[in-house]
């Protein structure tokens, strides 16, 4: 099955206590600042997986819940990264 973020959201994965804890840690670590463009305190931001989640790696802590694989992006930068990934260019390691 192909990974779909909406399906994962519907499954409750993003409500797990483990995800919520690491998400909050990354927000603090990155000081509510987009690591790509430097936007500070934007209302809309995403804790982004550098190595994209797939159904195959969703249960792999080193990918799904490892702070070293997470970064804070503003919505604009996150959308650009996601579009690039979907076009088949792979993951940008900004």
UniProtKB/Swiss-Prot annotation:
<comment type="similarity">
    <text>Belongs to the skunalikevirus HNH endonuclease family.</text>
</comment>
<dbReference type="GO" id="GO:0004519">
    <property type="term" value="F:endonuclease activity"/>
</dbReference>
<keyword id="KW-0378">Hydrolase</keyword>
<dbReference type="InterPro" id="IPR002711">
    <property type="entry name" value="HNH"/>
</dbReference>
<dbReference type="GO" id="GO:0008270">
    <property type="term" value="F:zinc ion binding"/>
</dbReference>
<comment type="function">
    <text>Probable HNH endonuclease.</text>
</comment>
<dbReference type="GO" id="GO:0003676">
    <property type="term" value="F:nucleic acid binding"/>
</dbReference>
<keyword id="KW-0540">Nuclease</keyword>
<keyword id="KW-0255">Endonuclease</keyword>
<protein>
    <recommendedName>
        <fullName>Probable HNH endonuclease</fullName>
        <ecNumber>3.1.-.-</ecNumber>
    </recommendedName>
</protein>
<dbReference type="Pfam" id="PF01844">
    <property type="entry name" value="HNH"/>
</dbReference>
<dbReference type="InterPro" id="IPR003615">
    <property type="entry name" value="HNH_nuc"/>
</dbReference>
